[in-house]
Curated annotation (Swiss-Prot):
GO terms for molecular function: cytokine activity; growth factor activity. Disruption phenotype: Adults display microphthalmia, with eyes obscured by overgrown skin and misshapen irides. Mutants at 2 weeks of age show profound alterations in the morphology of individual photoreceptor subtypes and UV cones. At later timepoints loss of normal retinal lamination is observed, together with a disorganization of Mueller glia cells. Adults, cone photoreceptors are dysmorphic and reduced in abundance. The gene is gdf6a. Homodimer; disulfide-linked. GO terms for cellular component: extracellular space. This is Growth/differentiation factor 6-A. Disulfide bonds join C303-C369, C332-C401, C336-C403. Glycans are attached at N91. Residues 278-304 have a biased composition (Basic residues). SUPFAM superfamilies: Cystine-knot cytokines. It is found in: Secreted. Residues 263-304 are annotated as: Disordered. First expressed in late gastrula stage embryos (9.5 hours post fertilization (hpf)) in anterior neuroectoderm corresponding to the future dorsal part of the brain. Shortly after tailbud formation (11 hpf), expression expands to the entire neural region and is subsequently expressed in derivatives of the lateral neural plate and migrating neural crest cells, with the future midbrain and hindbrain showing strong expression. Also expressed weakly and transiently in the posterior embryo from 11.5 hpf to 15 hpf in the lateral mesoderm, and in ectoderm above the neural keel.
Length: 404
């Protein structure tokens, strides 16, 4: 999965550099004329990706994940909420404390009940958090535990029960909260703030937590089965999830992210150099093809925003991208000739360059039609650890075009 995502990002970057003039930042168009050559011709693209996957240590691991990943309802809800906000033009950044995050990663509990224990005094939760990167700033974390409708539970004088979250190693208290079963005996999610846990995690790949419940001022531990915290007959959607909120320490670049993924797979310098050579060759071919087209009728149109529909399923990315399966990216196309229109918001340099080009086209190239304003989109995808991740990627949709 990691290899496929890396290749996908790499292919995306190569195309970005292939757009007219100044390599404007737009995504790959699936619509092209039948006779037109393209650096991403179907057969060549498939062969290119196949070569990289075959040489990747992660390629063999991709077939190991036979069980389909089912996204948790909570993650789907997050995606729908923030993608809807983006469509309304609102700031879709969600927040934790006074900081904003652009990534939410969900880790599903891998623990199992010991059916020999009756009553069940402790519930153990296991999470594989090896995919968390130290290059991202942690800005929040919460443990979401589904509590089924309680059965015949030992009565509490106040009706209030205390949830205690402990570390498996030291039984050090990590978080706590109270629930009132007199007010609510229906099934619901209990949420514990576990941000502080990661301050003591020390780069461990496995996170082990234990839950116990007491009532009143008593230290007596209540049978968790009676309270509805047992795992028996639970669906995948009812398993506990650890939700981690992170923020990139710097503005993300898809190409840089792809390079980091190649390094994490352990590829040697020779393989990386080969990829860079292929990228340069394809970029040159793409630029030559596109420059050749600019002598046609389409080159007469002025710089403006054009349609560019991206279909992730047609690209073969739907095995790791959950949503959206397609979106409108747009791109900038057209000439920047003199006099430049004010709505194109040309820079002073672009105005001078365009004027020089109008007087002597052979000595000065024209200014470039490029995106001047871009917006983000939300993507829900599966990472290399088979965890479902929500991420907000910047600069994915062209909003305005201009001459630069």
């Amino acid at each position: 999965m990691d290899a496929l995502r890396a290749v996908a990002f790499y292919a995306l970057f190569v195309f970005l550099w292939s757009l007219p003039c100044c390599q404007s930042a737009a995504l790959i168009s699936q619509k092209r004329s039948k006779g037109a050559r393209s650096a991403f011709d179907g057969q060549r693209s498939h062969k290119f990706l196949k070569e990289i996957l075959a040489s990747s240590p992660g390629a063999s691991r991709r077939d190991d994940f036979k069980d389909p990943v089912v996204p948790h309802d909570y993650m789907i809800s997050i995606y729908r909420t923030y993608s809807a906000a983006e469509k309304l033009g609102l700031n879709a950044s969600f927040f934790r404390s006074s900081k904003s995050a652009n990534t939410i990663t969900s880790f599903v509990d891998k623990g199992k009940d010991d059916l020999t224990l009756s009553p069940l005094r402790r519930q153990t939760y296991l999470f594989d958090v090896s995919t968390l990167s130290d290059k991202e700033e942690l800005v929040g974390a919460e443990l979401r535990i589904f509590r089924k409708s309680p059965g015949d539970v030992q009565p509490s004088p106040s009706g209030v029960y205390n949830l205690h979250l402990l570390s498996c190693r030291s039984e050090r208290p990590l978080a706590s909260r109270s629930i009132d079963l007199q007010d609510s005996r229906k099934a619901e999610w209990e949420v514990l703030d576990v941000w502080g846990i990661f301050k003591h995690r020390h780069q461990e790949n496995q996170l082990c937590l234990q839950l116990k419940v007491t009532y009143g001022k008593s230290d007596t531990e209540i049978d968790l089965k009676q309270l509805g915290f047992h795992r028996h007959s639970r669906t995948q959607q009812e398993r506990a999830i650890l939700v981690v909120y992170t923020r990139s320490k710097k503005r993300e670049n898809l190409f840089n992210e792809m390079k980091e993924k190649i390094k994490s797979r352990g590829d040697d310098d020779e393989e990386e150099s080969a990829l860079q050579f292929k990228a340069r060759r394809r970029r040159r071919t793409a630029l030559n093809n596109r420059h050749g087209k600019r002598h046609g009728k389409k080159s007469k149109s002025r710089c403006s925003k054009k349609a560019l529909h991206v279909n992730f399923k047609e690209l073969g990315w739907d095995d790791w991208i959950i949503a959206p399966l397609d979106y409108e990216a747009y791109h900038c196309e057209g000439v920047c000739d003199f006099p430049l229109r004010s709505h194109l918001e040309p820079t002073n340099h672009a105005i001078i360059q365009t004027l020089m080009n109008s007087m002597d086209p052979n000595s000065t190239p024209p200014s470039c039609c490029v995106p001047t304003k871009l917006s983000p989109i939300s993507i829900l995808y599966i990472d290399s650890g088979n965890n479902v991740v929500y991420k907000q990627y910047e600069d994915m949709v062209v909003e305005q075009c201009g001459c630069r």
